[in-house]
Amino acid sequence: LITFVMITSSIFSQQIANEIYNWDDPSIVGSTAYDNAYNECWGVTINNHEIAIIGSTEGTHFFDITNTSNISEVAFVEGAYTGPGVIHRDYHDFKGYLYAVCDEGSSSTLQIIDISNLPISVNVVYDSNNLFSKAHNIFIDTATAKLYSCASTNYAMDIYDLTNPTNPALIYSYDDVGHVHDAYVKNDTAYLNCGYDGFKIVDFNNSNIASNNNHVELAS
């Protein structure tokens, strides 16, 4: 019976895991820390095309995967910081723009990339460290047009208004914990991985952070 289960499981695994494409550029160096050349992935649908996005130590790569028998890299944006010092990038999209960050390098920036013309081309419309340089993770609450930047400044997490998608504006800094590793936010309710400080649920409703310059912790 055990042998049968193992064989059945093996056959089932082969049936559901069918590799349809592999891309690996040997010219892209791995990180010094972990030897990882690639670090993050994201996906969008633009102009009826399915686009896969992958981060590397060199920057951000865009692939048209609409036709799985003809997948190709259609665009590339070099990171502000590149090379073996890069371990981690992160992405999120909003209203036809891709927001890209890197967690390493003094020259890192927030990059905002216009992806509305994919799969033909992309265009970097913002590339600056005026708001922050490095960030471990970002999340965009699309319902409220807010970008949450984790561990990007002296604060655990910062919140930016994306009413103007190409000109983010800082509206609040959260500093109740030492570090926010990652976040998921829906309608201003943030579910936060706070590392050594555990898991927290926080309400960042505009009425709280604007008028009271405060937030409401719902659970921890």
Label every model-predicted segment.
Residues 1-16:
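Bacterial Sec-dependent N-terminal signal peptides
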